[in-house]
Regions:
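Conserved N-terminal catalytic core of the sugar/cofactor nucleotidyltransferase
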Residues: 1-7, 15-18, 34-108, 114-116, ...
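A structure-centric signal for secondary-structure junctions around beta-strands
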Residues: 2-3, 25, 103, 148-151
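Active-site beta-to-alpha loop of glycosyltransferases that engages the nucleotide-sugar donor
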Residues: 11
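Conserved N-terminal glycine-rich FAD pyrophosphate-binding loop of Rossmann-like flavoproteins
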Residues: 14-29
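Amphipathic alpha-helical segments in well-structured domains
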Residues: 25, 33-34, 61, 121-126
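Conserved beta-strand scaffold positions in the cores of enzyme catalytic domains, especially
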Residues: 28, 78-79, 137-139
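Conserved core of the sugar-phosphate nucleotidyltransferase
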Residues: 118-171
Length: 171
């Protein structure tokens, strides 16, 4: 079964100052001929993925639809977040969509991450896709070296996630 990518695209995306503005989050900034959301949409065109779900808010809806059209993604679902409440509620609201089969794996991706080695990205997904069951979750990313108020992160024990820390406050 193909993985259903869920692109989290509702955040303010302000950590690329001075390029970000109130009306334009970093996932929508035009870097000449590409945007971070555009790169994310291109990544999920790989054969291992099903039609994407984009979790966003009403403020970004027009820009999301423009990107879907530009990248020729015709089959998709958009989930509008009722209020901006961080990552976990966006994941939960998307995971509760009724027409997603229970056995279909979901992969949550940030709209504003730059992944340059797409081949390695897809290889890591394929390798771990075989290990997925309805009882587990596969996550991967850059291992944090210290707590940061810029990023949320997972705590693990014996390859199991024990807790998610949402962008901790600076000490």
């Amino acid at each position: 079964m193909k993985i259903r990518p869920v692109i989290l695209c509702g955040g303010a995306g302000t950590r690329l100052w001075p390029n970000t503005k109130k009306h334009q989050a970093k996932q929508f900034i035009d870097f000449g001929n590409w945007t971070l959301l555009g790169k994310t949409l291109e990544r999920v065109k790989a054969s291992i993925f099903d039609a994407p779900i984009i979790s966003t808010n009403a403020k970004y809806l027009r820009q999301v639809k423009q990107h879907l059209k530009k990248h020729k993604i015709r089959k998709f679902k958009i989930v509008l977040e009722p209020a901006k409440r961080n990552t976990a509620p966006a994941i939960l609201s998307t995971a509760l969509i009724e027409d997603i089969p229970n056995e279909q794996p979901l992969m949550f991706l940030a709209a504003d991450h730059l992944i340059e080695k797409v081949g390695l990205f897809n290889k890591a997904i394929k390798k771990n896709q075989k290990k997925l069951t309805h009882n587990n979750i596969f996550i991967f990313g850059i291992k944090p070296t210290m707590p940061s108020s810029e990023f949320g992160y997972f705590l693990t024990k014996n390859i199991k996630v024990t807790k998610f820390i949402e962008k901790p406050k600076q000490a």
